[in-house]
């Protein structure tokens, strides 16, 4: 099971605690939707900001979160590739 969370109201004037919760759900701006795994933690976060979001239970699983390389490693790999390209030419 998965939860579809959608930000339906503006979070202007919300406390910093609520803003952190909204960011924790992966919502960045008005109208954003996320498909999240149905866990007690996610349900608790959604309940905390229930006046700003809508919840919908969806059959199937939520997609696995994508992992990103830390910026330092990605930058190093690009620099190595650039140097190799310069040495080749």
Swiss-Prot record:
Q: Which GO terms describe its biological process?
A: translation
CDD domains xref list:
Ribosomal_L30 (cd01658)
**Does the record's keyword annotation contain Transport?**
no
Disulfide bond positions: none
The UniProt entry, under InterPro entries, shows: Ribo_uL30_ferredoxin-like_sf, Ribosomal_uL30_bac-type, Ribosomal_uL30_ferredoxin-like
Question: Does the keyword Ribosomal protein feature in the UniProt annotation?
Answer: yes
Coiled-coil residue spans: none
Alphabetical UniProt keywords: Ribonucleoprotein, Ribosomal protein
Q: Which GO terms describe its molecular function?
A: structural constituent of ribosome
Which GO cellular component terms, listed alphabetically, does the Swiss-Prot or TrEMBL entry include?
Answer: cytosolic large ribosomal subunit
Question: Pfam families this protein is in?
Answer: Ribosomal_L30 (PF00327)
- What family is reported? Belongs to the universal ribosomal protein uL30 family.
- Which PANTHER family does this UniProt record tie to the protein? LARGE RIBOSOMAL SUBUNIT PROTEIN UL30M, MITOCHONDRIAL RIBOSOMAL PROTEIN L30
**Subunit and interaction comment:** Part of the 50S ribosomal subunit.
What name appears for this protein in its UniProt entry? Large ribosomal subunit protein uL30
For this protein's source organism, the top of the classification is: Bacteria, Pseudomonadati, Myxococcota, Myxococcia, Myxococcales
